[in-house]
């Protein structure tokens, strides 16, 4: 516990918060180019082939981003938009690719939670 005199001499230092998505550089989204599109296996209790992409961002970082939804059209040199948000069972994946923007197509035949997957409204007869 500091004395009053010590507080006058040097004030208390504020805690600096560490960001969970440093590659975004305080922006909500960043554009990037896919350098590799592949599948990855999740951590211990889960089993799947999760679709991920290695992306070189305009901020100069190269990050691993998750491709949400069923099926995708991404390949090497595709231009994508990424947002923050980790995938709990994939170590090192701290970003999501935004579906339905730039070169990323929306999910086909999606009727619920469409806005999260860039799917257009289906034609109702």
Swiss-Prot record:
UniProt GO molecular function: rRNA binding; structural constituent of ribosome; tRNA binding
Keyword tRNA-binding recorded: yes
Modified residues (3-methylthioaspartic acid): 89
Alphabetic keyword roster: Methylation, Ribonucleoprotein, Ribosomal protein, RNA-binding, rRNA-binding, tRNA-binding
An annotated GO cellular component: small ribosomal subunit
Subunit structure: Part of the 30S ribosomal subunit. Contacts proteins S8 and S17. May interact with IF1 in the 30S initiation complex.
Membership in a protein family: Belongs to the universal ribosomal protein uS12 family.
Protein name per the record: Small ribosomal subunit protein uS12
Lineage: Bacteria, Bacillati, Cyanobacteriota, Cyanophyceae, Synechococcales
């Amino acid at each position: 516990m500091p004395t009053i005199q010590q507080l006058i001499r040097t004030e208390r230092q504020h805690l600096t918060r560490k960001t969970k998505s440093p590659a975004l550089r305080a922006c909500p989204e960043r554009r990037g180019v896919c350098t590799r599109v592949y599948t990855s296996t999740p951590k211990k209790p889960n089993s799947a082939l999760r679709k991920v992409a290695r992306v070189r961002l305009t901020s100069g970082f190269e990050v691993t981003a998750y491709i949400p939804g069923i099926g995708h059209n991404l390949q090497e040199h595709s231009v994508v938009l990424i947002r923050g948000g980790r995938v709990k069972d994939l170590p090192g994946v701290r970003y999501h690719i935004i579906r339905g923007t730039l070169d990323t197509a929306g999910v086909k035949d999606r009727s619920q939670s469409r806005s999260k997957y860039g799917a257009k409204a289906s034609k109702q007869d």
